[in-house]
């Protein structure tokens, strides 16, 4: 397995979101950090997230990359280090 596969096998989107400060509520919903969100509109599934408000979507690496303005490789490294 490569770095990307390893990270995706170990870390769920919800785990990363909570670790990086997103408050995840009922139904795995959270306020989206990518737009001015006041009510939860981001669905966090096991393997991917989707925001019904702004359309942001991706996997755990994509979420981390967007949260910290990193490349996918840098985000995968950060996840490997943090988890």
Predicted regions, residues:
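N-terminal structured subdomain of primase-like DNA metabolism proteins
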Residues: 1-83
């Amino acid at each position: 397995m490569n770095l990307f596969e390893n990270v995706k096998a170990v870390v769920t989107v919800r785990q990363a979101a909570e670790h990086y400060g997103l408050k995840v509520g009922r139904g795995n919903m959270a306020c989206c950090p990518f737009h001015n969100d006041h009510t939860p509109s981001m669905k966090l599934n096991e393997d991917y997230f989707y925001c019904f408000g702004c359309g942001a979507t991706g996997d755990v690496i994509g979420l981390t990359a967007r949260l910290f303005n990193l490349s996918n490789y840098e985000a995968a490294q950060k996840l490997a280090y943090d988890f």
